[in-house]
Amino acid sequence: MLFRSVYFDFDSSAVKGEYKPVVEAHAGYLKKNPQRKAQIQGNTDAQGSREYNLALGQRRAESVKSMMRVLGVPENQLEAVSYGKEKLRATGSSDADNAENRRADVAYDGE
């Protein structure tokens, strides 16, 4: 089973080293399955304005997408979108809840 989420530090769009294997696994899957397409969905915690979080979510999605491109995934298999703070996974406001929401999710076509 592939883990679907890459988590980020507060106000960051840099993929942390511990999540590079997750990105590499998805890149490998996509290269072996050229008919599949992936949407990388950038998300943020609830802190900050809607506009800022949409931009941050987009940077997170683009960061994962760029890493996949470097790993050899063709552009036409990837789409980066931002949901900002619209798709919170954890609805509380603790540090742990906020950390759970700072992520990029990989979703495949047909899912």
Where are these regions (language model features)?
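A non-catalytic structural micro-motif
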Residues: 34-43, 58-89, 102-111
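Short, conserved glycine- and acidic-residue-centered signature motifs
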Residues: 19, 53-61, 99
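Short, small-residue-biased leader/transition segments that mark boundaries at the very start
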Residues: 1-2
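Second-shell loop/turn segments in exported
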Residues: 9-15
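Extracellular/periplasmic catalytic domains that process cell-envelope and extracellular macromolecules
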Residues: 31-33, 97-100
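Short, exposed beta-strand-loop hairpins at the edges of beta-sheets
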Residues: 72, 95-98
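Short beta-alpha junctions and helix-cap segments that line functional grooves
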Residues: 90-94
